[in-house]
Amino acid sequence: MSTGNLDFEQFRVFLEKACGILLGENKQYLVSSRLNKLMEQQGIKSLGELVQRIQAQPRGGLREQVVDAMTTNETLWFRDTYPFEVLKNKVIPEFIRNNPGQRLRMWSAACSSGQEPYSISMAIDEFERSNLGQLKMGAQIVATDLSGTMLTNCKTGEYDSLAIARGLSQERLQRYFDPKGPGRWAVKPAIRSRVEFRSFNLLDSYASLGKFDIVFCRNVLIYFSAQVKKDILLRIHSTLKPGGYLFLGASEALNGLPDHYQMVQCSPGIIYQAK
């Protein structure tokens, strides 16, 4: 596979237009590792040829396969821990006080392989076990990703031992998963039932998503340019109910937009409240 500078630049432009991801100039190795097998299968010898093939058939399956390969990321259960503790100890109790009798509605944006929305669902179950009857109308979690392949896998709720080992305690494994044969586990139906998976591009219109009380958009914005990041944050704000909360990744910060979000210092961690 050839990754000449001109070919690589063409591919960078294509990927940013397709899904907003801005590849660094030193990411040829990443592109090669993600696309080598696909390009060999298609008989494509360079990134320039790949882009030309996609442009010739912009609605073809090759475009989706390439975007899938470049946006697929494995993640962890209960990543960074604190967001899920803040959710249980601060945000859900506050929601119940301010919205008696209403259903909690959450969005897990760019949910990848599904660990985040299922972790959220487990955290909600843990809250309900400790606070019987308080979340009377229950909760809905809308989980979106650009990758159709990942969403298909997410919906099954099945994971191998390697994925299970990444952040999941034995206690939660025993409580929330059923064994599905050697080295495989499935999320229990009660946890899966809260989660609705949808295909969604963060650059598209947000109108179909509706309004949310809480949005998790963690470890996603680092892949976008500053302008695209700002645009996405403004769009997310449009989906948040007044006073709703945005959770970003531990290494991400919301710089700017003081008219839209207020920083809330938790212990530990930081979240953002919609004005």
From Swiss-Prot:
A Pfam family assignment: CheR
Ranges for domain CheR-type methyltransferase: 1-275
Described purpose of this protein according to its UniProt entry: Methylation of the membrane-bound methyl-accepting chemotaxis proteins (MCP) to form gamma-glutamyl methyl ester residues in MCP. Methylates the McpS chemotaxis receptor.
**EC class of this enzyme?**
transferase
State the deletion phenotype.
Mutants are deficient in chemotaxis toward malate and casamino acids. Mutation does not affect biofilm formation.
Q: Which reaction does it catalyse?
A: L-glutamyl-[protein] + S-adenosyl-L-methionine = [protein]-L-glutamate 5-O-methyl ester + S-adenosyl-L-homocysteine
Query: Assembly state and interactors?
Result: Monomer.
Species of origin reads: Pseudomonas putida (strain ATCC 47054 / DSM 6125 / CFBP 8728 / NCIMB 11950 / KT2440)
Q: Which residues form a coiled coil?
A: none
Query: EC no.?
Result: 2.1.1.80
Superkingdom per UniProt:
Bacteria
Q: Where does S-adenosyl-L-methionine bind?
A: 73, 75, 79, 116, 145, 201-202, 218-219
The record's Gene Ontology biological-process terms are: chemotaxis; methylation
**What InterPro entries has UniProt attached to this entry?**
Bact_Chemotaxis_MeTrfase (IPR050903), Chemotaxis_MeTrfase_CheR (IPR026024), CheR_C (IPR022642), CheR_MeTrfase (IPR000780), CheR_N (IPR022641), CheR_N_sf (IPR036804), SAM-dependent_MTases_sf (IPR029063)
Task: Please give one Gene Ontology molecular function term for this protein.
Answer: protein-glutamate O-methyltransferase activity
Q: What is this protein called?
A: Chemotaxis protein methyltransferase Cher2
Going by the UniProt record, its keywords in alphabetical order are: Chemotaxis, Methyltransferase, S-adenosyl-L-methionine, Transferase
